[in-house]
Swiss-Prot record:
Name this protein carries in UniProt: Macrodomain Ter protein
Function, in words: Required for spatial organization of the terminus region of the chromosome (Ter macrodomain) during the cell cycle. Prevents early segregation of duplicated Ter macrodomains during cell division. Binds specifically to matS, which is a 13 bp signature motif repeated within the Ter macrodomain.
Top-level division of the source organism's lineage: Bacteria
Gene symbol of the encoding locus: matP
Subunit structure: Homodimer.
Record localization: Cytoplasm
Pfam families per the UniProt record, alphabetical: MatP, MatP_C
GO molecular function, one term: sequence-specific DNA binding
GO cellular component labels: cytoplasm
Organism: Klebsiella pneumoniae (strain 342)
Main location: cytoplasm
């Protein structure tokens, strides 16, 4: 496993995930009967800061169909949590118009690179182009100066 699991922290994430799903209207319990499901949800809402009880609630009451999705969500959250500790692994987000994202994604796919690698490559290409243009301008100026002095 690449990232250390922190039971107390992840228990809070799981609790928040389940409460969010419940508020969005998803069935988070394994019970078909509405009163049993509501009783289980009420229990969940009272144990927010009790990692051991949250874990026990998940094993006893959670809808099994939700398990994989929750695991994936927690895994992604764990990765973001640990990556945020170091500046070089911290992720930033930017808003792109759909058409821009589509073109960037197509370019990245053609180059066989990630979106981040493609953006870095485009920036480097632009920097090289600026450097080249500056050099050419300087050479042109020097050449005109040489020709003008004769």
């Amino acid at each position: 496993m690449k990232y250390q699991q922190l039971e107390n922290l992840e228990s809070g994430w799981k609790w928040k995930y389940l409460v969010k799903k419940h508020r969005e209207g998803e069935l988070i319990t394994r019970y078909i009967e509405a009163s049993a499901a509501q009783a289980a949800v009420d229990d969940l809402l009272t144990i927010e800061n009790e990692p051991v009880l949250v874990h026990a609630w998940i094993e006893q009451h959670m809808n099994p169909a939700l398990m994989n999705r929750m695991k994936q969500t927690i895994r992604a959250r764990r990765k973001r949590h640990f990556n945020a500790e170091h500046q070089h692994t911290r992720k930033k987000s930017i808003d792109l118009e759909f058409v821009v994202w589509q073109r960037l994604a197509g370019l990245a796919q053609r180059r066989g690179k990630t979106l981040s690698e493609t953006i870095v490559q485009l920036i480097e290409d632009a920097e090289h182009k600026e450097k080249y243009a500056s050099k050419m301008s300087s050479l042109k100026h020097d050449l005109q100066e040489l020709l003008g002095k004769e």
